[in-house]
Amino acid sequence: MAKYAMVIDTRSCLGCGACIAACDLENDTEWRDGRRRTHVPEFFFGEFPNVTRLFVPRLCMHCENPPCVSVCPTGASYKNEDGVVLVHHDICIGCKYCIVACPYMARYLDERKGVIDKCTFCYDNRVTQGRLPACVETCVGHARIFGDLEDPNSEVYKLAKSGVAVQLRPDLLTDPKVFYIRRAVEE
């Protein structure tokens, strides 16, 4: 089995929003109260005129130890054999326990459907067909890299194992499968 992961290079992210649009189109989602499956907040460092702007794309971290799964009372939230954290919409009751449990704030209630929604790495509609997630395929800056974390020939494997790409909040012990290449603020 594969163990899918993503590396996001914050040095290459342009903040253009192509990943957001591709995700919305691919997954028939729409913007609701500022929540989407993926979003790209921007951060500013320094003082004028020496200001650095940084974009940090955020999505579900597809944790190895996902707190959202353990709190789900119906079993709707689960981690599949490829390590992708998903939601069975047909048994989700929209209780929001998983939203509260997620330390990365990656889940939201899709009010149109009354169920929890989040990034799926486009698992069912693309990855199982041998295609890349829509956000990866569309990224203008080539900032998103997707692959098998257990395949030594995979770029994701090489970046994660080299220490170049790091996890957000490793102190939470969730072991997220989305890694980031950091941009030095001084750049």
Please name every model-derived segment.
Residues M1-E187:
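Non-ligating segments of multi-cofactor redox enzymes
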